[in-house]
Amino acid sequence: MSVSFEAKETNRGVLTFTIGQDAIKPELDRVFNKVKKDINLPGFRKGHLPRAVFNQKFGEEALYQDVVNALLPAAYEAAVAEAGLEVVAQPKIDVVSMEKGQDWTITAEVVTKPEVKLGDYKNLAVSVEATKEVTDEEVDAKIEAARNNLAELVIKEGPATEGDTVVIDFVGSIDGVEFDGGKGENFSLGLGSGQFIPGFEAQLVGHAAGEEVNVEVTFPEDYQAADLAGKQALFVTKIHEVKAKEVPALDDELAKDIDEEVETLDELKAKYRKELEASKEVAFDDAVESAALELAVENAEIVELPEEMIHEEVHRAINEFLGGMQQQGISPDMYFQITGTTREDLHKQYEADAEKRTKTNLVVEAVAKAEGFEATEEEINKEIEDLAATYNMEVAQVRSLLSPEMLKHDIAVKKAVEVITSTATVK
């Protein structure tokens, strides 16, 4: 194989390589033996057409496209490796020549990884808003939330107030004409919950069971049903019941109802404090990591980040997200239908942070290289075992799905993140 690379501009160039006859000839034989099985030619049994007759009738060139398609991926990877390139986007391939009996010449327009000039990445001083401290108010709020979950709705005499639940019938109309989806019976609506369009719930406050209320609202301009968006509507609403939330007393019995592992309210408070401390410590560490990585990227210089890298990161993130949805039994089509969005919407959503993620990845990889981080066999095995446990898969199955090189890369990157984060101090 002959390989050459010509740089055209920063992080871009043309890779030229050949595919030799030593690879072409056996692949020609394989492709011919495959296609001849389907050829019907008078005078020859199906699948027994001589090669010479095929070449005379169709020309050997008829096989070339299948041959180059089969050989190109491995040949391209070998050429990239021989040229010592780190390609970061899909290449633009051009078959320059496929002459009979000659080596074939291929060119690939490639985008290469940009140079990263590291600045300070150790012993960084960072500021974070997160704190590890847990206050009494936070513990009380957690207990109050659990207490509210045990609340019961009881019939209330008198007018409804914010926070009450009303049981209603309603019929909606626009200019006196009822519309689809505008009718409901015995519907439980929490006042202040925001379940209905803006202004609806507020107009029921102050009214009691047995009353009929004419609720006048305007559908938002961005309402999901385009035929209703921006239009004024009247909902004739009958209130059947008004219910108020009745919360249990704040005592030891409540504590036991909330958590069967405790006997007293003080024990519940102590348990909740530990849980909050653990979660806040994780949040604090995440905040420090994020701030340290951001500062390390800010201190580095990335020489002309290719736009293609950002696009690749967007596609990677989307595929990872949709793959996660698929594991939960939600197909991409189902997700877009449920959310009322499109793949283009998802692309815009991820595009906003793609440049930041791409720069962070480049800097972290550069740190791993500068520090000489590598993965040991023991670390690789542990990573596979951890992934198997996370996704409830067999270790052997995970091992078969992941390439050793990818695992080595991920482990080295984790070490780089650790050295950036662990040496950082909070101002």
From Swiss-Prot:
Domain PPIase FKBP-type: 163-248
Biological processes annotated in GO: 'de novo' cotranslational protein folding; cell division; chaperone-mediated protein folding; protein transport; protein unfolding
Principal place of residence: cytoplasm
Annotated keywords: Cell cycle, Cell division, Chaperone, Cytoplasm, Isomerase, Rotamase
GO molecular function, one term: peptidyl-prolyl cis-trans isomerase activity
Gene3D superfamilies: 3.10.50.40, Trigger factor ribosome-binding domain, Trigger factor, C-terminal domain
Top EC category: isomerase
Catalyzed reaction equations: [protein]-peptidylproline (omega=180) = [protein]-peptidylproline (omega=0)
Subcellular location: Cytoplasm
InterPro entries per UniProt: PPIase_dom_sf (IPR046357), PPIase_FKBP_dom (IPR001179), Trig_fac (IPR005215), Trigger_fac_C (IPR008880), Trigger_fac_C_sf (IPR037041), Trigger_fac_ribosome-bd_bac (IPR008881), Trigger_fac_ribosome-bd_sf (IPR036611), Trigger_fact/SurA_dom_sf (IPR027304)
Membership in a protein family: Belongs to the FKBP-type PPIase family. Tig subfamily.
Note on domains (UniProt): Consists of 3 domains; the N-terminus binds the ribosome, the middle domain has PPIase activity, while the C-terminus has intrinsic chaperone activity on its own.
This protein's name: Trigger factor
Originating organism: Streptococcus suis (strain 98HAH33)
Lineage, uppermost ranks: Bacteria, Bacillati, Bacillota, Bacilli, Lactobacillales
Recorded name of the encoding gene: tig
